[in-house]
Amino acid sequence: MKRLLAFIILFWSLLGVVYGQNEFEKKVYVTASGDSLNYRLLRPEVEQSGEKYPLVLFLHGAGERGSDNEKQLFHGSQMWLNPVNRENYPAFVLFPQCPESGYWAYTERPSSFEPDQMPSNVPLSPTFTVLKELLDTYLAMPQVDKQRIYIMGLSMGAMGTYDMTIRYPELFAAAIPICGTVNPNRLKAAKEVKFRIFHGDADKVVPVNGSRQAYKALKAAGADVKYTEFPGIEHVSWNLAFTQTDFMNWLFSQKKQ
């Protein structure tokens, strides 16, 4: 009987996740030259006429690459579907999906994730070229608040988060890179963006030094930056980051001056 009850609970829980993910509209952006990018869109639950809403760009990790337009919701989407968050923090939320052969900020996977060995001269990747076009279409919408554009990502997506803020610091009010890395010499360009960085000190995939050095570089540049390091946590620090009690409030409190 207990096993049956556990199965029923699990079944309805999974059903709820699938149903919730269906609230993210399936979209495909196609450029004039024919390049495309899959993405999912969550709209504010209630859109008031004349109201402007923040826009959040969420960049997934390497494990969620593909072409199914679903895997990118595996981490992070439930946070946005939480009824309390839906009510208190209405926003347009974009979850693009990086192609299997792509790597968000880079044309190929960096040979080392140690910050001093990360590329310092980074050409715009094909995936980010299309993503920037997609982002521009939403920035042109009158219901999007241009002063409250946020970006966050985990692992490969955190590397993309750093890269986007370096290239387009004028766009983003705040950024949350989780267990990422970047060449710290590039970060001076992003000093006007407010950062909140997370990492686990036992991460064996992306060394924690990536976040430590990013924090130091941003701090030295005069940026508004906060760093949280989780003791004993490996390459899953997003699970703890998403449950920080002030996670949403901090993000949605940020606004471009």
Where are these regions (language model features)?
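Alpha-helical scaffolding within the catalytic cores
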Residues: 74-84, 179-187, 209, 213
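Bacterial Sec-dependent N-terminal signal peptides
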Residues: 1-23
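Primarily recognizes the serine-hydrolase "nucleophile elbow" in alpha/beta-hydrolase
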Residues: 136-191
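A domain-start/cap signature at the N-terminus of enzymes
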Residues: 17-55, 91, 127, 133, ...
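Gly/Ser-rich "nucleophile elbow"/oxyanion-hole loop immediately N-terminal to the catalytic nucleophile
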Residues: 46-51, 105-154
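Active-site machinery of serine-nucleophile hydrolases
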Residues: 62-128
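Alpha/beta-hydrolase
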Residues: 57-59, 178, 230
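C-terminal catalytic histidine-bearing segment of alpha/beta-hydrolase fold enzymes
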Residues: 194-257
